[in-house]
């Protein structure tokens, strides 16, 4: 039964995606709408940098969709709006799979094995996912942002993807496969910073899922400790890693040019290769037998988040 359920789960998820995409693409804004949307459309079409703190990865992705306008800039707004529609439909897809993953834990909690799932349980899980996904599809707030060139549609997609990835890790945490999900999750978080900082709010949920998986008999004290740790992680990324990564590059550039008399961009190039060297060192360290698994995971997570950080360099030029 479990094989049939996995197939149906994938099929129903893509049905939810098609329904959402059809809804949004047929109700999408034909041109620019209010607030920041005209600015984002212009930045995507012209390769410009938007208002602080900047949304560089959003603009790069928008520029890709503007290419489908075929050089007709009058259609640029429509294509960036369509980008939001498709990413919103993608958010619905991962929302469906998230709901079914969580519902399955409740419905099948008394089953001795995964193969003990019954048809009634499978139908309950799939219908729960479809109802939840479609209710969110046609909710006023989400539908409103799904049809215009705002960062919230893209950010919602990133948020849904990140939370789904931690649930996939939770179900497959043993071995190398589980580590791959953690690495991909860290990279998506790094990229999402170039869209909107909303994605960082997933970190407390991610930390709790990780903690409960590692500590099945978790207590209140440990749960509160995990939440406090997640707050420190958010603060470190928000106030340390994001501004510090760019600020350090600027300080090295100023020292190289003003202090050492080097040509322009010397410090920036040095900093770039220095970061690459650190990442290479982390990879080399992973092959050392005396390195603990916990240290490796921390190095990999921090390094992969930094891989997404170059998209934030555009913020420094605002």
Task: Map each language-model feature to its residues.
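Start-transfer (signal-anchor) and selected internal transmembrane alpha helices
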Residues: 1-23, 90, 113-130, 276-308
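Transmembrane-helix motifs of polytopic, lipid-linked glycan transferases
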Residues: 14, 82-117, 161-165
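Aromatic- and kink-enriched transmembrane "portal" helix at the membrane-lumen/periplasm boundary
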Residues: 26, 73-81, 109-122, 129-156, ...
């Amino acid at each position: 039964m479990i094989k049939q359920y996995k197939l149906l789960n994938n099929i129903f998820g893509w049905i939810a995606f098609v329904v959402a995409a059809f809804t949004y693409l047929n109700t999408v804004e034909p041109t620019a709408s209010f607030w920041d949307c005209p600015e984002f459309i212009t930045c995507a079409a012209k390769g410009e940098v938007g208002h602080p703190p900047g949304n560089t990865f959003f603009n790069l992705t928008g520029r890709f969709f503007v290419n489908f306008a075929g050089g007709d800039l009058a259609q640029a707004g429509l294509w960036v709006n369509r980008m939001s529609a498709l990413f919103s439909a993608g958010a619905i897809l991962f929302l469906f799979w998230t709901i079914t993953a969580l519902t399955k834990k409740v419905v099948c909690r008394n089953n001795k094995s995964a193969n003990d799932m019954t048809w009634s349980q499978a139908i309950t899980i799939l219908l729960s996912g479809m109802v939840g996904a479609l209710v969110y599809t046609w909710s006023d707030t989400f539908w409103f942002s799904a049809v215009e060139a705002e960062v919230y549609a893209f950010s919602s997609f990133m948020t849904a993807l990140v939370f789904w990835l931690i649930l996939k890790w939770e179900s497959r945490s043993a071995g190398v496969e589980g580590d791959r999900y953690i690495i991909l999750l860290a990279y998506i978080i790094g990229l999402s910073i170039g869209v909107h900082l909303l994605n960082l709010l997933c970190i407390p949920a991610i930390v709790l899922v990780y903690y409960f998986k590692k500590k099945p008999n978790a207590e209140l004290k440990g749960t509160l400790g995990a939440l406090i740790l997640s707050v420190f992680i958010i603060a470190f990324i928000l106030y340390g890693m994001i501004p510090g990564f760019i600020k350090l590059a600027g300080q090295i550039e100023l020292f190289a040019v003003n202090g050492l008399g080097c040509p322009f961009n010397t410090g920036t190039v040095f900093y770039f290769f220095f970061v690459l060297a650190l990442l290479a060192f982390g990879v080399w360290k992973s092959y050392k037998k005396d390195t603990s698994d916990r240290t490796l995971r921390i190095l990999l997570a921090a390094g992969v988040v930094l891989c997404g950080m170059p998209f934030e360099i555009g913020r420094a030029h605002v």
